[in-house]
């Protein structure tokens, strides 16, 4: 299905070039600091826990002046029960293979009541759709029908907000908000759960035709378990990586909670695919935000690591990964606290505040529960209102495309990370960044396979021979003569 873009600003017919995007995506250093608040996976804040959602909203209102809060972004799974399809008046007009929870209407009403607190105080709320927010959410293949989402939340998108519409002119749960903060214009772009290829195409057009920073939000993008054949042993707890596989023939094993398990109608695009096709393809993508993943499995706070349901792509730590050894390195954050606490306490009411400082060129995060602070007796003893560990309180520098520090990187441009390849296959890589480079080296499973001197890229026609069948770690590293250090890029490939 082809998608049409309803835009409230004039879209140029010509795409920006990468250099033009980079040049015009700047955030003015004279702009004031401001904050965006994330509400991750609020799905369990219903029935007797509905006060938690309201506590979050009331806290945001109380802190709006001090933190200069400009928006609240829901990361999806606003409710837990989906619901039967409804008409514009909320009357049930369809059935589901699997009946939704009997409280589904109450859940929507309670969520909207909490959101109304924000609206009544002039705080913008952007409701990204999650898998639990679709009609008949438990059916497989999962429907794309979102009548309840639009009935209860569809009037939140006040101008200048625009939806991506389908070829029949119907709006889809994919939309963007243009916000001017200081002298800079930002786009907050919310995309559906595992976006369909045509939605990704429409999003690419939007980003390409927008000259400012873009914050991409989608419910399922990052995972924090290093979901790949070898990553679990080499990635630190709390490190994020794109969820499952999104490009053809990828070798990465998916979590059970994946695109393959939901089989959404119309297909979809998950983590690796979103990185290659959208998030990593534009210099003006400033941040990518997601929820959905709650690993390890749920349990009470003292018994579950602090990184449950959280993670981030920190290129100062994991510079060798595909997400860091690329020309563009947007800030990427996973936030999902629903797995912390036994049933009745899931989530503990944690929200996340991102403070953007244009003058310092940093984004600082902290994680806080207004409910624990206000009602400690409602929660198990020892649960902190502020999460002060490094997984939940951290600072990013701006990406270099927005004036942050630039550095030398090595980028393997072919084959893609996770590809199936023949025993002997061509490889290409390039050095990117501000520094002079010396030689390049290729390694397979830790064994050096070649040296190339005084080059900024591997010579055309360079091939790698693998030692046998199976999964192999292929690395290309470049010597940064200015910093006097090696920088590398790593991919995993498999051969028959």
Please describe what each predicted stretch is.
Residues 344-407:
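A short C-terminal boundary segment appended to hydrolase-like catalytic domains
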Residues 38-40, 70-77, 125-130, 191, ...:
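Active-site neighborhood of phospho(di)ester-bond hydrolases with catalytic His/Asp-centered motifs
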Residues 405-496:
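Long, low-complexity serine/threonine/glycine- and acidic-rich segments characteristic of extracellular
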Residues 45-47, 80-82, 129-138, 172-173, ...:
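Active-site environment of divalent metal-dependent phosphoester hydrolases
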Residues 23-103:
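N-terminal active-site segment of His-dependent metallophosphoesterases
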Residues 253-358:
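Conserved beta-sheet core of the metallophosphoesterase superfamily
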Residues 90-104, 209-286:
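Active-site-proximal segments of metal-dependent phosphoesterases and phosphodiesterases across multiple
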Residues 84-201, 209, 243, 253, ...:
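Extended active-site neighborhood of metal-dependent phosphoesterases/phosphodiesterases
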